[in-house]
Amino acid sequence: MEISKITSPEDWEYFAKGAANILFKYTGNNDYLKRKLLRLRLLKQEEEYISTCELYDFIELRCKDLFPNQIIDIQLTVLDSNFTNKLNSQGNKLMLNERYGLLLPNILDGDYRKISLSQKCQLYFNDNDQDINSVIFEIKPKWLYDNYTDNYCRTCSLNQLKKVPRHFCPLDLLYTETIEQGLNDLFAPIPQDIYAKIEKLIPLKKLTTIYFNNPDNVFQKLKQYQKINNKNDLIKNLTSYSDVSQNLSLVMTLRDVGLFIKIEKFDKNNHIHTSHNNIKNVYRINDNKSNGTKDQDQEIGTNDEEDNDEKFLITCNIYDLDLKSKMKYKHWLKVENDLQEIYNSSNPNWRYCIKYDQIHH
C-alpha cells in the first residue's frame, strides 16, 4: 500500500520518538487510518541501520511465532520522499532513503491521563466523568533471568550506572514469593489520591497479582526466550561483529522491548472483549474472596454461579521489536565491562535484588 495515495502529510502529527524510530499520529478522516500510528526510521549510520523491510520480516517470521497473541499488528506501507519530507518531524532527522514505513494501532487512542512513574514506566488511565474504565502500564521489562550470584541484577546495575533512581526490580515480578514486593514498588510513585480512585473502580493490586502469578504471563515468556543456551552468545565472549549470532540478536531485541499492559472493565457487548483471542484474558473478582480468579477455558456470558463476579480484561501488547544490529557488539561489551564493579557492590539507597537460591532452596 502506498500511503501517499490515501493520505497527505498534513494528516499526521508528531506523537513520540525513541532511539531508532519516530511515531506520527493520524488526525485525518480516513476511517481505515483512524487510531493508527505511522512509524518511520530515524537517521542512523549506514553500518548500524536495519531497514524497515528487514525489521518487518524479523517481526513476522521470528517473533510472532514466539508471541502469537502479544505482538502489535503491523502493516508495511510504501513511502515516497515527497511525503516523508513534508512530515512535521519537529526537527528530528529521518532516514530519507527508506522506502517503507510501518502502520500500527495506537494503543493509547482515547482520553488518557499520563503519569510518569519512572524513566521506563508510564501509567495511563481514562478519567471521563470520574469513571475509570481502563488503566494502561507502559513498561520495559529489560533483562529477565534467574540471578544466582549478584547483589544487583543487570537492569538495576545499569540504572545505578546511569544514576537513574530506583523504581522496581523486574526480577521481583517473576516469582510468587516476590510479586507483592515488586508490585508495591511499581505502584509506589502513583499519587495516593489517584491510586485510591483507581482501586475503587479497578482492583489494580489484586488483578496484577493474579496476572503475574499466571505462568503464561508475558514476563515469563520473555524470560524463557531471553535465555542464552550457547556460551558463544554470552556478551563477554564476543570478539567481533561476526560473533553475533541470529539468536543473540533476537535475545538482545527481546531484552529491550516495551509492553503495554491494559486492564479494563469487561464489556460483554464489546466484540473485541468476547473474541476468541481474549477468552483466556478475562479475570473475575469477587469482593467476598481474598483473591480473584482467572477464567479457565470458560465461555464468556454463561449463566453460572459466578455471574455476579466482576469481570476484567487484561491484555498485553509487545512493541519496540527493533532488531539489534551486529555492530552494537562493541557497545554491549563496553556496558558489560562498566557494570562489573556494580553487580556486587552495596548501595544503601538500593535494595539488593532477589537471588534465585533465596526462594528455591
Curated annotation (Swiss-Prot):
Reactions that this protein is recorded to catalyse: 1D-myo-inositol 1,3,4,5,6-pentakisphosphate + ATP = 1D-myo-inositol hexakisphosphate + ADP + H(+)
Source organism of this protein record: Candida albicans (strain SC5314 / ATCC MYA-2876)
EC number: 2.7.1.158
Database matches in Pfam families: Ins_P5_2-kin (PF06090)
Superkingdom of the organism of origin: Eukaryota
Domain observations: The EXKPK motif is conserved in inositol-pentakisphosphate 2-kinases of both family 1 and 2.
Protein name: Inositol-pentakisphosphate 2-kinase
GN (gene name): IPK1
Entry keyword set: ATP-binding, Kinase, Nucleotide-binding, Nucleus, Transferase
Chain location of the short sequence motif EXKPK motif per the record: 138-142
